[in-house]
């Protein structure tokens, strides 16, 4: 921010905070008549945001007119939450006029409750319902929803919405609004906009105090950090005095922020003064020093940190988080001798010293810079040995989580197995970290090691552990292992549930083993496990016959199972797969379908029609939704691209990708177009498309690397392999994206050279392996041998064969067959000429 703007902000800030306790009448008078004198001169109040009175959003109902205020507000809420009603077009703009539906607020219960959007017991989505952190996820969703509303409606309008819906804004809402204002000010390069946001944050703090709310760190913390980063010392002191008066219990945290400030402005005198003196806050010296140490760690003030640490009694530090920060910073600073001295002190003086020290060793070992996972484990074990203690279960749990986060799952499994041998308790959290990491790295076969670990008596799994394990078994088609998991439940006094059986059933359906899937349904009933909506969704989706669809739907209704969104989706997909496109569309006409699910179901209908050959109807529904400004799910757009007619224009497909806001979905859609171009002989346009979008592609994106492999795979699979475009893609990846082609990319391209019998291109690809430092393997040698034989270069072909190990019978067989298949056939021209001569003589 420019110096002048910063000084203006300082003047405004002082004025606002010093008048925080004034009444609304005095504040209004000050706003009407006063002007501010800053270091840069007078600041006109007409140019400053109205900090000290209610701030109206440009889209507030008062700006539209009193008669139309209520529907306008309802429309804004509907738009923000993407709530749609059947028979209405929400927030349409025609000829500049906004049209809003009636009774939108009646259908919108979400913000007036804390968790549920219906008075009936809600059948939650599969993932949320079945996990332990359901409440946390709901909290995250509500926070995300609140942020979306604020972004689209504005802060003040959002508060007004809450009031109109019978929910007063509470501490959480004010905290969120204050934090959002500071975030906006921090991100903005516009001084005037930043001033406006700071003013709103001040107003929120004042309102919280006037309403009697406790002003916690969630509200003032981001504000203080912003002032620290802006090095606004005077403003910091004003805010500090305000918070100290409004919330006396916050004194401990205020000294932490004060230390951050003096470190930021590099005021060594103030830093030393704080480190050596008790202030008037009533806090003990040890507590103050604890906060100061954390601040010094955060700001990387190594010299002052060491000086303070020399006079601090580490055994008086009570906060586990503070100790974690201190020892993490010791590791970061490579101060092992200091760390060992403190660890010995903690080990010898505390009742829980051994466990505390073990946890701190983990913090130290994993924060050492430029160290590998192996280095961290070595240091972890070494320090435990030197201190003559055994790692605690908690430190092991932290270490396993750290390894899983680093994708070192095999190493994490080794450690857990060692824990079993040592008789340490294996908590459900450890198992969940392992299972999540296995799914993340796609090494599903590692779940078999989890199964052997769970046979140990020291393991404490729960139902969710078994559900996740069964799901991973199904991913590798290990149905026997999944059933073994089910049988093992009784050993832990756990009962099977529908989600476990559903995973097995879905696996059988995906493998087209319908009888086995139906057998699972029978086993559920025998185990007294009632089928739920997910069960019936699978049965309907995969039954494949119109009569069976009706049968399962009727059975579900008779069982009293709620028909939720997923069931309607299954009905749409099932009818479409049977070719009953009209019935698929009629599902959406059911009056019981909730209005909030209507657009999502339309998106499913688009996907179902497109994937079952009715691309024309799918596009028609898509265009209709766009005209009505209804959101279309990314998966539906991807399905339209993937199932497009071979004559579709590339420009039309590119326009579809413009609707994909999320970068992951956009990358999927864009590369599906590239694959489409390869498969439909449109290769000439590929490089142009890549050049136009190269700024949106990152070499660090795993999705980009994966999709380039898919493109090369398509090149290898086409009948007339376009090797040249493959070589051009390699050059583009290296030069424009600085991305080295993976082994899969080069393997597919070499295979394309075999199909095209293109020796020169194959030699270029062969060089790329060396550039990428990829060693040649048997498959590479065989492919190159086939190209050389096809080119008639027998000498080079034999040289390649000599490098292939001859102890594999299958490889020998492939070489023999390749020689027969790829050796060029000699044309018998002489024989043809003789036959021609004989025919002439006969004439």
Curated annotation (Swiss-Prot):
Cited PROSITE patterns: PPR (PS51375)
Compartment annotation: Mitochondrion
Keyword hit for Mitochondrion: yes
GO cellular component, one term: mitochondrion
Keywords, in A-Z order: Mitochondrion, Repeat, Transit peptide
Keyword Transit peptide: yes
Primary site of residence: mitochondrion
UniProt repeat feature PPR, residue ranges: 392-426, 427-461, 462-496, 497-531, 532-562, 564-594, 598-632
InterPro entries tied to this protein: Pentatricopeptide_rpt, TPR-like_helical_dom_sf
Family statement: Belongs to the PPR family. P subfamily.
Protein name (Swiss-Prot/TrEMBL): Pentatricopeptide repeat-containing protein At4g21880, mitochondrial
Biological source species: Arabidopsis thaliana (Mouse-ear cress)
């Amino acid at each position: 921010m420019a110096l002048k703007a910063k000084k203006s902000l300082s003047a405004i800030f002082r004025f606002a905070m010093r008048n925080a306790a004034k009444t609304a009448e005095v504040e209004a008078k000050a706003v009407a008549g006063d002007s501010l004198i800053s270091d840069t001169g007078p600041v006109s109040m007409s140019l400053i945001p109205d900090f000290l009175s209610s701030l109206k959003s440009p889209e507030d109902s008062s700006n539209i007119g009193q008669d139309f205020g209520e529907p306008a507000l309802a429309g804004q809420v509907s738009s923000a939450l993407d709530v749609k009603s059947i028979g209405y077009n929400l927030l349409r703009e025609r000829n500049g006029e906004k049209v809003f539906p009636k009774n939108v607020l009646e259908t919108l219960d979400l913000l007036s409750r804390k968790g549920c959007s219906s008075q009936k017991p809600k059948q939650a989505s599969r993932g949320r319902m079945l996990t332990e952190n359901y409440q946390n996820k709901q909290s995250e969703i509500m926070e995300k929803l609140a942020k979306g509303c604020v972004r689209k409606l504005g802060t003040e309008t959002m508060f007004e919405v809450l009031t109109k819906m019978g929910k007063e804004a509470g501490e959480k809402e004010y905290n969120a609004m204050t934090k959002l204002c500071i975030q906006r000010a921090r991100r903005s390069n516009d001084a005037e906009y930043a001033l406006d946001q700071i003013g709103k944050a001040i107003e929120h703090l004042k309102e919280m105090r006037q309403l009697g709310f406790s002003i916690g760190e969630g509200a003032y913390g981001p504000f203080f950090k912003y002032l620290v980063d802006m090095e606004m010392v005077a403003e910091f002191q004003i805010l500090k005095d305000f918070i100290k008066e409004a919330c006396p219990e916050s004194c401990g945290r205020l000294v932490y922020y004060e230390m951050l400030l003096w470190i930021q402005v590099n005021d060594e005198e103030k830093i030393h003064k704080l480190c050596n003196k008790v202030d008037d806050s009533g806090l003990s010296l040890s507590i103050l020093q604890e906060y100061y140490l954390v601040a010094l760690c955060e700001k990387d003030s190594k010299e002052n940190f060491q000086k303070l640490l020399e006079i601090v009694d580490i055994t008086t530090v009570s906060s586990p988080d503070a100790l974690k920060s201190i020892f993490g910073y010791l590791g970061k600073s490579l101060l092992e001798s200091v760390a060992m001295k403190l660890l010995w002190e903690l080990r010898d003086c505390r009742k829980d010293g051994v466990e505390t020290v073990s946890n701190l060793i983990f913090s130290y070992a994993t924060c050492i810079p430029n160290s590998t996972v192996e280095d961290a484990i070595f240091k972890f074990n070494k320090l435990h040995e030197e201190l003559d203690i055994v790692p605690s279960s908690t430190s092991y749990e932290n270490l396993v989580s750290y390894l899983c986060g680093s994708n070192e799952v095999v190493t994490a499994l080794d450690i857990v197995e060692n824990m079993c041998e040592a008789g340490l308790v294996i908590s459900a959290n450890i198992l969940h970290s392992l299972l999540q990491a296995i799914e993340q790295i796609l090494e599903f076969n590692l779940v078999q090691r989890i199964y052997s670990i769970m046979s140990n008596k020291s393991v404490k799994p729960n139902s969710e552990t078994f559900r996740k394990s069964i799901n991973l078994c199904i991913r590798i088609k290990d149905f026997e292992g999944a059933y073994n998991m089910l049988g093992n439940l009784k050993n832990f006094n756990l009962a099977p549930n529908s989600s476990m059986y559903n995973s097995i059933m879905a696996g059988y359906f995906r493998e087209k083993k319908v009888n086995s899937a139906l057998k699972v349904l029978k086993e559920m009933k025998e185990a007294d496990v009632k089928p739920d909506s997910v069960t019936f969704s699978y049965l309907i989706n995969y039954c494949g016959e119109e009569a069976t669809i009706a049968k399962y739907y009727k059975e579900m209704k008779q069982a009293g199972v709620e028909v939720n969104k997923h069931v309607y989706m299954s009905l749409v997909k099932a009818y479409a797969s049977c070719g009953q496109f009209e019935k698929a569309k009629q599902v959406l006409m059911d009056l019981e379908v909730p209005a909030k699910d209507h657009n999502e179901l339309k998106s499913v209908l688009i996907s179902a029609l497109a994937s079952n050959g009715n691309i024309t109807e799918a596009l028609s529904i898509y265009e209709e939704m766009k005209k009505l400004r209804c959101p279309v799910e990314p998966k539906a757009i991807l399905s339209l691209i993937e199932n497009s007619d071979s004559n579709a224009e590339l420009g039309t497909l590119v326009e579809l990708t413009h609707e994909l806001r999320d970068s992951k979905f956009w990358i999927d859609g864009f590369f599906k177009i590239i694959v489409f171009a390869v498969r439909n002989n449109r290769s000439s346009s590929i490089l142009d498309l890549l050049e136009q979008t190269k700024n949106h592609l990152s070499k660090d994106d795993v999705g980009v690397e994966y999709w380039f492999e898919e493109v090369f795979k398509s090149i290898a699979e086409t009948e007339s392999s376009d090797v040249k475009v493959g070589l051009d893609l390699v050059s583009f990846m290296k030069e424009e994206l600085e991305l080295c082609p993976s082994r899969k990319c080069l393997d597919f391209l070499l295979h394309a050279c075999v199909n095209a019998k293109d020796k020169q291109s194959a030699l270029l690809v062969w060089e790329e392996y060396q550039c990428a430092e990829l060693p040649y393997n048997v498959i590479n040698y065989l492919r190159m041998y086939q190209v050389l034989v096809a080119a008639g270069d027998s000498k080079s072909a034999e040289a390649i064969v000599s490098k292939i190990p001859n102890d594999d019978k299958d490889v020998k067989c492939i070489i023999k067959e390749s020689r027969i298949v790829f050796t060029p056939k000699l044309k018998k021209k002489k024989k043809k000429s003789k036959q021609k001569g004989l025919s002439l003589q006969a004439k």
